């Protein structure tokens, strides 16, 4: 399973990249605003800065909600860097734009997916990635991981090449369970990656090794 980090924070991206396990980055307008990145030129430059840190795909989301606007913004984003994946909303216009881009060899990520039917439409439109939001489904007492399983079954039934990008990942068990189910990619905060390093028995074992070493070298 590929590991993406869901942030626009360059320091966090660099920290994840330094681990040697990062495969890409996902962003959205909210994450850009959180980092104080505003204005078209600044936003576009920030995407390039991210691409210069990582070697993998970088999802850059359109702001337009109309078809023509999505096409215009998506083409501009795709021209920025060959690592850019155009991120589109799961709407009628978004699916139409996804088909337009896929027919022209431009990679896409259809986001805000909350049902297997939406994921099926994204695959039919040729999306490179579909992004089901598991954490937000959990928030309303729905099983987000079950949606990943449903999408996996559908995609396997028909041989769709669209990759399942598990989004709204909140914690390490989301990561592990997505891997068990067969998600192609997970994207989450830095904490969801760093958290995989930790286990109390590992900490106890390391402390014991250090104590034994120091005892034997007094």
From Swiss-Prot:
Record's signal peptide: none
Reactions listed under catalytic activity: D-sedoheptulose 7-phosphate + D-glyceraldehyde 3-phosphate = D-erythrose 4-phosphate + beta-D-fructose 6-phosphate
Pathway(s) annotated for this protein in UniProt: Carbohydrate degradation; pentose phosphate pathway; D-glyceraldehyde 3-phosphate and beta-D-fructose 6-phosphate from D-ribose 5-phosphate and D-xylulose 5-phosphate (non-oxidative stage): step 2/3
Major localization class: cytoplasm
Active site: 87 (schiff-base intermediate with substrate)
Cellular component GO terms held in the UniProt record: cytoplasm
Keyword Transferase: yes
MF-aspect GO terms: aldehyde-lyase activity; transaldolase activity
Pfam family, one: TAL_FSA
GO biological process assignments: carbohydrate metabolic process; pentose-phosphate shunt
Cross-referenced InterPro entries: Aldolase_TIM, TAL/FSA, Transaldolase_3B, Transaldolase_3B/F6P_aldolase, Transaldolase_AS, TSA/FSA_arc/bac
Annotated localization: Cytoplasm
Statement: the UniProt record of this protein carries the keyword RNA-binding: no
This protein's UniProt keywords: Cytoplasm, Pentose shunt, Schiff base, Transferase
This enzyme's EC code(s): 2.2.1.2
Name of the top EC class for this enzyme: transferase
PANTHER family, per database record: FRUCTOSE-6-PHOSPHATE ALDOLASE 1-RELATED (PTHR10683:SF40), TRANSALDOLASE (PTHR10683)
Family listed: Belongs to the transaldolase family. Type 3B subfamily.
Role, per record: Transaldolase is important for the balance of metabolites in the pentose-phosphate pathway.
Name the record gives this protein: Probable transaldolase
Species annotation: Flavobacterium psychrophilum (strain ATCC 49511 / DSM 21280 / CIP 103535 / JIP02/86)
Gene name per UniProt: tal
């Amino acid at each position: 399973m590929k590991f993406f980090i869901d942030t626009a924070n360059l320091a966090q991206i660099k920290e994840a990249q330094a681990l040697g396990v990062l495969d890409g980055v996902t962003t959205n307008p909210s994450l850009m605003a959180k980092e104080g990145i505003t204005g078209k030129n600044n936003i576009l430059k920030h995407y390039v800065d991210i691409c210069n840190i990582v070697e993998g795909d970088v999802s850059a989301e359109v702001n337009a909600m109309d078809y023509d606007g999505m096409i215009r913004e998506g083409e501009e984003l795709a021209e920025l860097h060959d690592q850019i994946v155009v991120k589109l909303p799961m709407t009628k216009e978004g699916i139409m734009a996804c088909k337009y881009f896929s027919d022209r060899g431009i990679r896409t990520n259809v986001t805000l997916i909350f049902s297997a039917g939406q994921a099926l439409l994204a695959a039919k439109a040729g999306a490179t990635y579909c992004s089901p939001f598991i954490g937000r489904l959990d928030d309303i007492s729905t099983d987000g991981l079950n949606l990943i399983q449903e999408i996996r079954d559908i995609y396997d039934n028909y041989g769709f090449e669209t990759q399942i990008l598990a989004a709204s990942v909140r914690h390490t068990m989301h990561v592990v369970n997505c891997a068990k189910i067969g998600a192609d990619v997970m994207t989450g905060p830095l904490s969801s990656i760093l958290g995989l390093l930790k286990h109390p028995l590992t900490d106890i074992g390391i402390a014991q090794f250090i104590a034994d070493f120091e005892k034997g070298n007094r």
